[in-house]
Amino acid sequence: MTKKKAFTPLPYLASIVFLPWWISFSFNKSLESWVIHWWNTSQPEAFLNDIQEKNVLEKFIELEELFLLDEMIKEYPKTHIQKFRIGIHKETIQLVKMHNEGHIHTFLQFSTNIISFAILSGYSILGNEELVVLNSWIREFLYNLSDTIKAFSILLLTDLCIGFHSPHGWELMIDFVYKDFGFSHNDQIISGLVSTFPVILDTIFKYWIFRYLNRVSPSLVVIYHSMND
């Protein structure tokens, strides 16, 4: 049983981390060409919602103004006006393709995230025994660490999550999650989450020290405060 506890959790933990990612990645790559073909053939006209249509029109107007400005400066003859119209047409098609690719990316990312969630849910439902062994293995590993190493690890983790330089890391992480789920970048929402998450984590962490660590390991709390000061 001791040997099982020592070696079984390692491949199981690796499968929890890498298996959902590998299956989702394979699913994404295998269906990408089919989804692109289906989207381009079944949705020839209505490919934008109101917000996206507004964004496309704004970009198109900006593009048209740039072309007109270029024509006014260079004073091209009528032959170049025709080239100008062709250029506008090509750029419009490019904008349509770009937004279609955004829709396809959102659909694929949403599907792969659902698959990853389903796999992790299957682990939690079907792998109760393995999770118990993994939990006991982690507890035993943490218990064997010295209080100094524990305090250093807690201090390092808190500085990374709620320290002075943590907002930039949170901004990158939230932006990555936004892109992973297919959402467009929004500075207001990201700045709001960046200013909120560290405060919530700091409150939870202080409560955890006060409620749990003071009761379980007072010496660890003393070492942590000494290192933090």
UniProtKB/Swiss-Prot annotation:
GO terms for biological process: potassium ion transport. It comes from the Eukaryota. The chain crosses the membrane at residues 7-27, 114-134, 154-174, 189-209. Keywords: Antiport, Chloroplast, Hydrogen ion transport, Ion transport, Membrane, Plastid, Plastid inner membrane, Potassium, Potassium transport, Transmembrane, Transmembrane helix, Transport. It is a multi-pass membrane protein. Coiled coil: none annotated. It catalyses: K(+)(in) + H(+)(out) = K(+)(out) + H(+)(in). The keyword Transport applies. Pfam families: CemA (PF03040). It is found in: Plastid, Chloroplast inner membrane. GO terms for cellular component: chloroplast inner membrane. One of its GO terms (molecular function) is antiporter activity. Contributes to K(+)/H(+) antiport activity by supporting proton efflux to control proton extrusion and homeostasis in chloroplasts in a light-dependent manner to modulate photosynthesis. Prevents excessive induction of non-photochemical quenching (NPQ) under continuous-light conditions. Indirectly promotes efficient inorganic carbon uptake into chloroplasts. Belongs to the CemA family. This is Potassium/proton antiporter CemA. It comes from Nandina domestica. The lineage of its organism: Eukaryota, Viridiplantae, Streptophyta, Embryophyta, Tracheophyta.
